[in-house]
Amino acid sequence: CIVCGNKKLNKFLDLGKTALANNFLEPEDLNLIDEEFYPLRVAYCNNCFHVQLIDHVNPKKMFDNYLYISSASKTLTDHLYSLAKVITRKIPFKRNDLVIDIGSNDGTLLSSFKKIDKKLEVLGVEPAKNLVKFANKKNINCVNSYLDIEVAKGIVSNYGNARLVTSTNSFPHIQNLHNFMNSVNELLSDDGVFVLEAHYLVDLFEQKAFDTVYHCLLYTSDAADDRMR
């Protein structure tokens, strides 16, 4: 189990071997015999009851060049702007407070924060080089890396601690959850806030949204609350 380390996972869904999500082939790559496929099996832990994938793809294969762009979806763009508005109402930001978005994609969420509160400083952490270029065009500064404790220490050294750290739908892709949370803790100031957004398992079942089952972790509210403590 990614969360508690328990060795016993109970499989309840097997979607067979599946190509990488958001991985579009060029015309010269259409020899499907050479396309990579991976098992897509879903299980729950009989200790902490977290639902998760049994098999994990090397993150570099999925995210070093990522083709899903947040701003391409008006629905998502509007949602992220609304999220930024809710957060800025709840947190009494001061001038030059730092907001860090983990898995910042093309900077859509951070751009929303800048529109709503121009006194904020923002920083993205994004492993996909192509997405960092899009963010930079929006004047969003990014660290082109996966987050770990050493990267977090480097960010604090260069930019200071964050009043807010966000992770919207990058959080369910995290394979080393404990390292990630330690890194977030390193980034946060003493009064810092961490906001995460993840797929809700109950909605997935009710909507039969099997097409979203490629995230490492799928959360219920109770399981998320328990593990964040």
Where are the language model's segments positioned?
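A short glycine-rich, Lys/Arg-flanked "PGG" loop and its adjoining helix->strand segment in the class I
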Residues: 179-193
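N-terminal juxtadomain amphipathic helix
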Residues: 2-75
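Conserved SAM-binding loop of SAM-dependent methyltransferases across substrates and taxa
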Residues: 106-117
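Single conserved hydrophobic/aromatic residue that forms the stacking wall/gate
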Residues: 219, 223-229
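Conserved class I S-adenosyl-L-methionine
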Residues: 96-105
